[in-house]
Design a protein with these regions (language model features):
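ATP phosphate-binding glycine-rich loop and adjacent ATP-lid/helix-beta elements
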Residues: 288-332
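Short, cationic-aromatic polyanion-contact patches
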Residues: 351, 357-360, 405-417
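Polybasic/polar functional segments that serve as interface/processing modules
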Residues: 1-32, 36-83, 88-90, 95-98
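Intrinsically disordered, low-complexity regulatory tails
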Residues: 66-133, 260-264, 315-318, 330-339, ...
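Short amphipathic alpha-helical interaction segments
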Residues: 384-396
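Active-site helix-to-loop segments that bind/position phosphate- or nucleotide-bearing substrates
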Residues: 103-263, 269-285, 289-298, 320, ...
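Short amphipathic alpha-helical interface segments
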Residues: 356-385
Length: 417
């Protein structure tokens, strides 16, 4: 047993546990075990019943507002289990400060995080706050609505229907994001060469409508990952990476990121993959497992997501990850998803079908490159079988046309066909 983000051990009762009560209440909840040392060894408490009363009094006297918690006395080993639920009346303060968990530590939140807790406690999202700039134009939004859903009139009633404007506060931040010109960040796209030291081209789209940002990102994608093959009198469009998958990834980055930080969505384009990193981790109330399973039931920017949905840029809310996985169902190398506290990263690999490779052949395939010849010495040490089997599998993969062999003897090298 060890400490985690939602589990803390306290061998004795000191006021430091109150910071953790604040942290658990402000976010996803958690458990504190009293009478257990830092290594998870049960020590017990001298007077567990009195300790239970002391813990209750300390919480009631020190945390505001009152957190939702439950105390359980474990008579068998004289320990106490304190279960703290995520609260609704955020922020929960200890000595006028709010706390959060950082891995297994408890730290004070910064000014930005504190303001987010205040909004969360009032059930207000950043996109709903009044926009700083109230002189906004919406030519791009108007054009897209007329093209995609055939609306005839675009006026303030349209903006009210989309929850972008109200008579009391004017335009909100969601409206600002969709306006032709704004003060918000956007997307920074970099096309790399053989390594990250070689930048072939950089494109940054910011301070314009997120609809324009979305379209510009697609244009850059098409330049690098789509091409035409002439077959007789016909031209056939080919894709190295699925445009549908890229669309989903970019749309998800735009509608699920945090917009109260001045950070760009970063798109790194390589010959064999694309990486999309969006600022902000998962919204409160969603676990990484739920996100990866496509169960994104909590929307950080509901109004913005609604516009993207109406325009047909996304399908059902929260299904982007599932859709991307489906598009790669027959691919040899699958997309990868990474979630951290402050960012979400999606990696879309070059789409290549699994041409009946065995599991061992797939292991080797993933170590080879489409652009660089590799000798067996750069493959064999990284596979879970011997050099002779590796050589045999490479020969079979060559016969299948999956890889190409160049050179002879010790100079033999391999490259993906």
């Amino acid at each position: 047993m060890r400490e985690t983000r939602t589990l803390e051990f306290k061998e004795s009762i000191t006021n430091t546990f109150l910071k953790t009560v604040s942290a658990f209440s402000n976010y996803v909840g958690g458990t504190i075990l009293f009478g257990v040392d830092d290594d998870g060894n049960i020590k017990g408490l001298p007077d567990a019943r009195q300790a239970c009363l002391d813990i209750e009094n300390k919480i009631n006297d020190s945390i505001t507002p009152q957190p939702d918690y439950m105390l359980e006395l474990q008579n068998s080993d004289q320990t106490i289990k304190l279960t703290v639920k995520a609260g609704l009346q955020k922020p929960y303060l200890y000595k006028s400060k709010a706390y959060k968990r950082n891995d297994t530590a408890t730290i004070e939140v910064d000014t930005l995080e504190f303001s987010r807790l205040v909004l969360d406690g009032k059930n207000i999202r950043f996109e709903e706050l009044p926009c700083k700039d109230q002189e906004l134009s919406f030519e791009i939004l108007c054009r897209k609505l007329k093209e995609n859903i055939r609306i005839e009139n675009f006026d303030k009633d349209t903006l009210k229907t989309l929850n972008l404007y109200n008579d009391d506060n004017g335009f909100n931040n969601a409206a600002g994001l969709l306006a032709d010109k704004n003060h918000f960040p956007g997307i920074d796209i970099v096309k790399f060469g053989e390594n990250i030291s070689i930048i072939q081209k950089r494109s940054t789209f910011e301070n314009v409508s997120v609809l324009e940002v979305y379209e510009k990102a697609l244009e850059v994608f098409r330049d690098y990952y789509q091409y035409e093959v002439i077959q007789g009198a016909d031209r056939k469009k080919m894709e190295k990476i699925s445009e549908a998958a890229f669309r989903e990834a970019i749309a998800n980055a735009l509608i699920h990121r945090v917009w109260d930080v001045d950070s760009q969505i970063r798109v790194s384009m390589f010959d064999d993959r694309i990486e999309i990193v969006s600022p902000g981790g998962l919204p409160s109330g969603i676990t990484e497992e739920e996100y990866l399973a496509g169960k994104l039931s909590v929307l950080r920017n509901r109004n913005l997501a609604n516009v993207f949905y109406r325009l047909g840029f996304v399908e059902i809310f929260g299904t982007g990850i599932t859709r991307i996985k489906q598009l790669y169902a027959e691919a040899l190398i699958k997309p990868d998803f990474e979630v951290s506290e402050n960012a979400i990263k999606i990696m879309l690999p070059i789409f290549e079908k699994n041409v009946d490779l065995t599991e061992d052949e797939i292991v080797i395939y993933k170590l080879l490159s489409k652009t660089m010849l590799k000798p067996i010495s750069e493959v064999a040490p990284y596979v879970p079988f011997g050099k002779s089997k590796t050589t045999k599998l490479l020969k079979e993969m060559c016969q299948k046309g999956v890889i190409t062999v160049e050179g002879k003897g010790k100079g033999t090298k391999y490259i993906i066909s």
